[in-house]
């Protein structure tokens, strides 16, 4: 059976839901999908389909990132539902890197919570450029002091966004109930609650600009996952960071071990074949003569000769203060945290510049890092620094040394 062709008739934008566990991120994702399907046509994805990663079943919390697609009148969106639980922030770092903008979900019954802060901070660190806010669970507020509560929560949110250098005063904030909107849409209507979801997506359409894609640069795609398809070969999935890729083009697989060359035999997006994949697309790339065990998450697919694996670099980093959830104590030369780059984490040891004895939480510092394994790096590559399951800093590669 021939696959349906992917049509590119609207601008494409990657967004996602972030926020505290149980504030309604997945319900909102389902509500957006359902309301837009009723209003503009398209496939409705229900809550279970979105909340469908295998690990979650046991604990009732979202761990893996779930990708769905939907359309407004103006745009085609790929939406990633980000993990909410603190233990799975690692996944948020890899998931949030896939966003041109985010919808921050906050329960108006609770206001901002610990993970709300952590996700805003992470968004800043991993370079999510725009945030739109949805104040959820409006239907659960006492009608008598509802307006006052919403105003209070809104004020808190704006202050919090400004604290992390997002434009708190200008951020669109829409109140509603994802659950009620979803119920209306399931009954085939866009009712008063559904209209609030439409208003939210209008704000997303207007406020989150269509990103300038890095189409003209050399092809680069971080590997997120690798599958074996019987009779067809090995498929690598990820989001193309730069450039374009067509069937028949040669690429290199870079990182960890030896660099390998191969040829692209297929490009697909949402199970539809494409003539070419381009920057910003989440897609699957079929590779000739490559076994599943030859590729792993954390490597990158690149245009031959454009990027090489490195272990040593100079970087500019910001170390979080204790108040921001960072370390409580300083660190010294020889400190060995994990460096999260694109889709991978690698241990590295830090060397402080001469004359700098230690780095205090809240400091900005330039240091040299040597990784235990080579990964694809270039100047400007961003990373997070983590230790013992929490983010302690963020940085950017200033210069490659080796």
Swiss-Prot record:
Q: Name one GO cellular component term.
A: cytosol
Query: Keyword annotations for this protein?
Result: Cytoplasm, Elongation factor, GTP-binding, Hydrolase, Magnesium, Metal-binding, Nucleotide-binding, Protein biosynthesis
- The annotated region (G4) lies at 136-139
Residue ranges for the region (G1) are 19-26
Please give the SUPFAM superfamilies that the UniProt record associates with this protein: EF-Tu/eEF-1alpha/eIF2-gamma C-terminal domain, P-loop containing nucleoside triphosphate hydrolases, Translation proteins
Documented EC number(s) = 3.6.5.3
Q: What does this protein do?
A: GTP hydrolase that promotes the GTP-dependent binding of aminoacyl-tRNA to the A-site of ribosomes during protein biosynthesis.
Name it: Elongation factor Tu
């Amino acid at each position: 059976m021939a696959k349906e062709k992917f049509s590119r008739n609207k601008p494409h934008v990657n967004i996602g839901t972030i926020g505290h566990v149980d504030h309604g991120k997945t319900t909102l994702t389902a509500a957006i999908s359902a309301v837009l399907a009723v209003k503009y046509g398209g496939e409705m994805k229900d809550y279970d389909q979105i909340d469908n990663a295998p690990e979650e079943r046991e604990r009732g919390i979202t761990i893996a990132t779930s990708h769905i697609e939907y359309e407004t009148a103006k745009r085609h969106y790929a939406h990633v539902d980000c993990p909410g639980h603190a233990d799975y922030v690692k996944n948020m770092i890899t998931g949030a890197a896939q966003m041109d903008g985010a919808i921050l979900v906050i329960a108006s019954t609770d206001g901002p919570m610990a993970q709300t802060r952590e996700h805003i901070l992470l968004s800043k660190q991993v370079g999510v450029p725009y945030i739109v806010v949805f104040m959820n669970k409006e239907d659960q507020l006492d009608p008598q002091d509802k307006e006052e509560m919403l105003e209070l929560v809104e004020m808190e949110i704006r202050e919090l966004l400004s604290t992390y250098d997002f434009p708190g005063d200008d951020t669109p904030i829409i109140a509603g109930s994802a659950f009620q909107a979803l119920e209306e849409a399931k009954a085939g209507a866009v009712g008063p609650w559904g209209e609030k979801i439409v208003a939210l997506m209008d704000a997303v359409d207007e406020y989150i600009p269509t990103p300038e894609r890095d189409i003209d640069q050399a092809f680069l795609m971080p590997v997120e996952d690798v599958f074996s398809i019987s009779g067809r070969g090995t498929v690598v999935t990820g989001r193309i960071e730069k450039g374009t890729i067509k069937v028949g083009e040669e690429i290199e697989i870079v990182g960890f071990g030896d660099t390998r060359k191969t040829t692209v035999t297929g490009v697909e997006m949402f199970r539809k074949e494409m003539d070419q994949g381009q920057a910003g697309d989440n897609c699957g790339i079929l590779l000739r003569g490559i076994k599943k065990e030859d590729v792993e998450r954390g490597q990158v697919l690149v245009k031959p000769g454009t990027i090489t694996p490195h272990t040593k670099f100079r970087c500019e980093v910001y170390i979080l203060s204790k108040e921001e959830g960072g370390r409580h104590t300083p660190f010294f030369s020889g400190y060995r945290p994990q460096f999260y780059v694109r889709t991978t984490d690698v241990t590295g040891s830090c060397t402080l510049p001469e004359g700098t004895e230690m780095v205090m939480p809240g400091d900005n510092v330039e240091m040299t890092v040597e990784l235990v394994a080579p990964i694809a790096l270039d100047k400007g590559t961003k990373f997070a620094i983590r230790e013992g399951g929490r983010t302690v800093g963020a940085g950017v590669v200033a210069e490659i040394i080796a």
